[in-house]
Amino acid sequence: MADSKKPAIKKPVPKGDRKANRRGAARLAAVQALYQMDIGGAGINETFAEFESHWIGNEVEGDQYLPAEAAFFRDVVSGVVRDQKKLDPLIDDALAKGWPLARIDAILRAVMRAGAYELEHRKDIPARVVVSEYVDVAHAFVEKDETGMVNAVLDQIARQFREDEFTRG
């Protein structure tokens, strides 16, 4: 995504306020925030303030942004920022040879960093759920081939951090 316009969450606000919907919206917002920080150089506090007051749960430029679990959004964004120097080599190792993370589109870097953070630190969420959720987030921004790369990278990282979840029957 070459331009600096923030990708819109174009799903209608769901009926009810299920935790899964709010977490999915938080993941999408976290990826957008990480992308914005990567491209625009905004700081974490400025980004939190902007997203929480102007984007999450609001209508912006005709698009309705879903309500999100703010604590989860903050955890993912702050965790990625804090652990990025550890997460990036994990992602690099999982990428195909000749495709360093620096060569990957900024939105995909944000997706993979957020997914890798959750896989390492959010053991309360099953690994397969994390991988699936971030593949879904990637679908909002990129073509199917690129979502396959996200799936492969996050699956490899999941097996590294949560091998037991893949060896049980």
Curated annotation (Swiss-Prot):
Q: Which SUPFAM superfamilies match?
A: NusB-like
One cellular component term from this protein's GO annotations in UniProt: cytosol
GO terms assigned for molecular function: RNA binding
Q: Which InterPro entries match?
A: NusB-like_sf, NusB_fam, NusB_RsmB_TIM44
> Which of UniProt's keywords are assigned here?
RNA-binding, Transcription, Transcription antitermination, Transcription regulation
Q: Which GO terms describe its biological process?
A: DNA-templated transcription termination; transcription antitermination
Region feature Disordered, mapped onto this chain: 1-23
In UniProt terms, what function does this protein have? Involved in transcription antitermination. Required for transcription of ribosomal RNA (rRNA) genes. Binds specifically to the boxA antiterminator sequence of the ribosomal RNA (rrn) operons.
Q: Which family does it belong to?
A: Belongs to the NusB family.
Q: What's the name of the protein? A: Transcription antitermination protein NusB
Q: Which organism is it from?
A: Rhodopseudomonas palustris (strain HaA2)
